[in-house]
Curated annotation (Swiss-Prot):
Transmembrane segments: none annotated. Residues 28-55 form a coiled coil. Forms a complex with MEC1. One of its GO terms (cellular component) is cytoplasm. Keywords: Chromatin regulator, Coiled coil, Cytoplasm, DNA damage, DNA repair, Nucleus, Phosphoprotein. Forms a complex with the serine/threonine kinase MEC1 which activates checkpoint signaling upon genotoxic stresses. The MEC1-LCD1 complex is recruited to DNA lesions in order to initiates the DNA repair by homologous recombination. Required for cell growth and meiotic recombination. One of its GO terms (biological process) is chromatin organization. It comes from Candida glabrata (strain ATCC 2001 / BCRC 20586 / JCM 3761 / NBRC 0622 / NRRL Y-65 / CBS 138) (Yeast). This is DNA damage checkpoint protein LCD1. It is found in: Cytoplasm; Nucleus.
């Protein structure tokens, strides 16, 4: 069925492409005809003008000779005048070449198809860095750096970048960019900027007395540098940047080592200042953005297998292992911002391994098995939209209130902390110490939202958490595709953890999500279907790696989850159109409005809208309504669930339960 759908979709795409090509060719032919017609008209007008100029000059010459000639020459002049109209006249042969030599055309040239003027990429890169602004911050990044100076470093001097103690870091960077702008190509400039900024960050961090005030904004400029033109970054620079970022993350690992629960003996008697903690949080999150960006740029460049293996060598994988063990922690409080970036890094790396069919993996199967163990633990966390900011229960996914700022790559959260970044500096004043920011300012914001019962931000965060779990499923799927029957990767743990995931999500459907007019339901449905497809693939192709003990551990949950998927198809047949119309008004009102807009669009395009279009629109909106009522999955996933139950589970289920199961399946 999937192949038929794909073929039908490809045929529709090919038909649309042929229509668009025919339309483009037709417009181009009409345009060429108009141009040719205009050219012919211009040529005829120019010929007519030349003829009139020649004729007027000939007449003027004859009149001049008549005025200066003696009377006895009148007869000769008149004969010459008559000869002007004769093609064989010797007068024309004598004077016309001279007139053509002195003629100057005043007709302006018209460029019918001007060439596109390509903007100077180096200047565009300079402008991009100069106007870069972090989302939610009032000042640009360069403007913030213009207010920051060294506090204990007397002078920084590395190649082309020179910064004195009394001058701002931003002015030094701008001078450096302007000096490089004149005599460097884009790829040279990008590598040079990354090298100088990384060296500057190292100099600040190595000095124990120097504050890290400027480091997060320097890291933000590095992210913008490699994202401006990914193809301009060399592979060697990317590898150095990857290792540098891993070292930077390990330098600030203390931020990731917060205890799961607050000690009852701990008493907060000190001042509730937040500026130094905020700077460390920014450095950590932006460093993970830099790590994620570097990995994605490597994927975009589509290197050969040899270059991939040289990039992801043993030393780099060791650095990456140390970073993911800090991020996907079990003993400390998780930070969802950096976990998201870490998972995105592994999605990209496993895509390279699986889709490029590499002969050797990046790391052994044992290396990846240890990673999966930590991902399974993250996959088991519950997602509740009314607990997204509650960090007291670590079994639920949540975002720390003091990490609630947008990263450089995704806008996750409410971004309540980002406006405080502009308060760290004072305009028109250069300082090496940040201004005071209090924790109470952030706490008061969330208490106010809690009292007002704001839920929209929570729903957005809920979707982000579901997307995170879906990315983890993509990692599992990629590793299954690459390692195939390796029991360290493809084993019963996949069945156990994904079955629990489906069971928990289906419970969430019944407890909180059914009959809610929100698109979170569709996102969660896609997550369940993705998990089911992996279980189906595991069951069909790698069944020898599934032990009986693994099946027994989740037998009841698996049977119940699959039964809920299968029985939905039979339940949906009992709902008539009138009932669906009533349900649609109650629980699918936004889709109902979207349907009405689509109908209005078709009515504007057609005098009488075809019946098949009406039926398709009604069918799509009814399917969406049934999904929100949890009474319908896609047919392909229903068949997957049926296959699993029919093929193998009957060996582990009693006869009575088997009869009930077949009855519910429609047999």
């Amino acid at each position: 069925m999937l192949r038929d759908k794909l073929k039908l979709l490809q045929a529709q795409i090919e038909q649309e492409r042929s229509k668009s090509n025919y339309r483009v060719n037709e417009v181009k032919e009409e345009f060429d005809k108009e141009i040719q017609k205009l050219r012919q008209q211009l040529q005829s007008l120019e010929d007519e003008k030349k003829f009139l100029v020649l004729e007027s000059r000939g007449i003027n010459a004859v009149n001049q000779r008549i005025k200066t000639s003696p009377p006895e020459a009148f007869s000769r002049v008149s004969s010459q005048h008559r000869a002007l109209n004769t093609p064989d006249s010797s007068h024309i042969q004598e004077h016309i070449p001279k007139k053509r030599k002195t003629e100057i055309s005043t007709q302006p040239s018209i460029v019918l198809n001007p060439n596109r003027v390509i903007k100077d990429e180096v200047s565009a890169f300079f402008d991009c860095l100069y106007v870069h602004r972090i989302v939610g911050v009032e000042l640009s990044t360069i403007e913030i750096l213009n207010c920051i100076k060294f506090e204990h470093i007397d002078e920084f001097n590395y190649k082309l970048l020179k910064i004195n103690k009394d001058t701002s870091i931003g002015s030094g960077i701008v001078d450096f960019l302007q000096s490089c702008k004149k005599n460097m190509k884009l790829n040279e400039l990008v590598d040079s900027v990354l090298e100088h900024l990384a060296t500057l960050i190292k100099a600040i961090i190595i000095n124990d007395q120097e504050l890290n005030f400027s480091v997060p904004f320097l890291v933000a400029l590095m992210v913008q540098t490699i994202l401006f033109r990914p193809s301009a970054v060399s592979v060697n620079s990317l590898k150095d940047l990857f290792i540098f970022t891993c070292d930077l993350i390990r330098k600030f690992q203390i931020v990731l080592k917060k205890p799961l629960h607050k000690s009852p003996l701990e008493v907060d008697l000190g001042p509730q200042i937040f500026q130094y903690e905020l700077i460390d949080n920014l450095i950590l999150v932006y460093s993970f953005d830099l790590l994620e960006s570097t990995t994605k740029v490597i994927r975009i460049q589509q290197l050969s297998e040899t270059l991939y293996m040289e990039f992801f060598d043993e030393s780099l994988m060791k650095s990456l292992e140390a970073v993911y063990k800090l991020t996907l922690t079990i003993s400390f409080k998780p930070v969802i911002n950096v976990i998201y970036s870490m998972v995105a890094v592994f999605v990209t790396i496993t895509n390279i391994m699986n889709n490029d069919n590499l002969s050797k993996p990046f790391g052994s199967s044992k290396w990846w098995s240890d990673l999966l163990t930590r991902l399974y633990q993250l996959l088991g966390k519950r997602i509740l939209n009314f607990h997204v900011f509650d960090d007291t229960n670590t079994n639920n996914m949540h975002i720390d209130r003091f990490f609630d700022f947008y990263s450089l790559l995704r806008n996750m959260g409410t971004n309540s902390v980002s406006p405080l970044l502009a308060q760290l500096v004072t305009r028109g004043e250069i300082k090496g110490i940040p201004n005071i920011v209090l924790k109470d300012d952030i706490i008061d914001k969330y208490e106010s939202k809690k009292e007002k019962g704001v839920l929209s931000d929570n729903l957005e965060l809920e979707k982000w958490f579901v997307y995170l779990k879906d990315d983890i499923l993509s990692i599992i799927e990629n590793l299954m595709g690459y390692f195939k029957k390796d029991s360290k990767i493809t084993n019963g743990e996949i069945l156990i953890n994904l079955t629990k995931l489906i069971s928990v999500e289906q419970s969430q459907f019944m407890d909180h999500l059914i009959d809610q007019d929100t698109d979170v339901f569709a996102v969660r449905m896609n997550l369940v279907e993705h998990a089911l497809s992996i279980i189906y693939r595991m069951w069909k192709y790698y069944e020898e790696n599934i032990t009986q003990e693994s099946i027994k551990e989740v037998e009841s949950e698996l049977v119940m989850s699959l039964w809920r998927i299968i029985v939905c198809k039979h339940a949906s047949k009992k709902i008539c159109k009138d009932d669906l119309m009533e349900h649609r008004i109650l629980i699918n009102q936004m889709e109902n409005l979207h349907l009405q807009d689509t109908i209005d669009l078709y009515e504007d395009a057609f005098e009488d809208m075809p019946e098949y279009i009406k039926e398709e629109l009604e069918c799509s909106i009814n399917n969406g309504t049934q999904q929100k009522m949890q009474v319908q999955y896609d047919d392909i996933y229903i068949e997957m669930a049926r296959y699993i139950l029919e093929s193998k589970l009957t060996n582990f289920i009693s006869v009575e339960n088997t009869d009930s199961l077949y009855l519910s399946m429609g047999f």
